[in-house]
């Protein structure tokens, strides 16, 4: 048994990297599900649903929104494309509800994002200051979903509320994990400073701030990322709430591989145009670097210890490697248990290691994509 200076250095490296890796985990911070302070009373609300041609999702989810048990006045506005007769038929079939209204996006809009035009038309049609914007395929978990979300909307201190979203149980595990992993960084920035972005297709904000800020001015040419640009432009320091309650839960159907990859590339392009993202990117890159560096050095130390018969160094390095894996998995388990997200726990260490490779492939796909896919400026 050899315990020399080199062994002490190897042991120190293994221990320090274990501590650094565990510190640099987005799952380390315990999520606060409960509303801070007294829950806000339900405010009059305008819910804007954007169809984007997804009539099947509208048919499935619109009745769930119309049947919401909401104590205050609720206006539901469905924004459809002009000439979308299937969506119009669905709205006519459900038009008996006094909550339901509709507007349309004209076909003549060519020089700006139709998605952002749809948002703008919906907000202008809203009669209440609090607006909840969502895609038509957002499925509420319960009849109290809107009530649960709006309890976080304190009028004096909150100007927007982010609602993290998850895929349904049929989704691939890595899709679910990647969405949660990215969302934790967005949630962290929102709770500890100023919100940077979101990967959910749902957001609560104030109509008067949207109108005073001239809507999407500055990003009208970007075809995608309406939720991310809204969060980035209108977030104020320490004024973004997060609705993590079980009853506030929203889910989306499982995307196809092609759809998921396109969403990832579009999100990457959108984030290139967002402001105040320095700290977000620094923390994200530090966490990824610490994860890989810890595993690499711990494995290298244990192998070197075995080859040179420094058994203590090898044993400590292996112990630190196992400790790193086990603690990270336990933190992931705590998070997915808190949020009640279906996921195979045994696969999560492999999902974590896959993140950087996935990001690299997304970057490559973005580089190979025609940039006119992201902007309405075709010059």
Protein language model annotation of sequence segments:
Residues 43-46, 75:
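Cell-envelope/extracellular polymer assembly enzymes that use nucleotide-activated donors
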Residues 1-39, 332, 359:
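N-terminal membrane-anchoring/stem segments of glycan-assembly enzymes
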Residues 42, 126-129, 155, 215:
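Active-site acidic short loop of glycosyltransferases
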Residues 158-182, 211, 217-282:
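Catalytic donor/gating beta->alpha subdomain of glycosyltransferases that bind UDP-sugars
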Residues 95-96, 104-114, 118, 122, ...:
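Long helical/loop segments within the catalytic core of UDP-sugar-dependent glycosyltransferases
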Residues 128-139:
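Short beta-strand-to-loop acidic/aromatic patch adjacent to the donor-nucleotide binding site
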Residues 4, 289-371:
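Membrane-embedded multi-pass helical conduit in multi-pass membrane proteins
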Residues 63-109:
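Acidic donor-binding segment of Leloir-type glycosyltransferases
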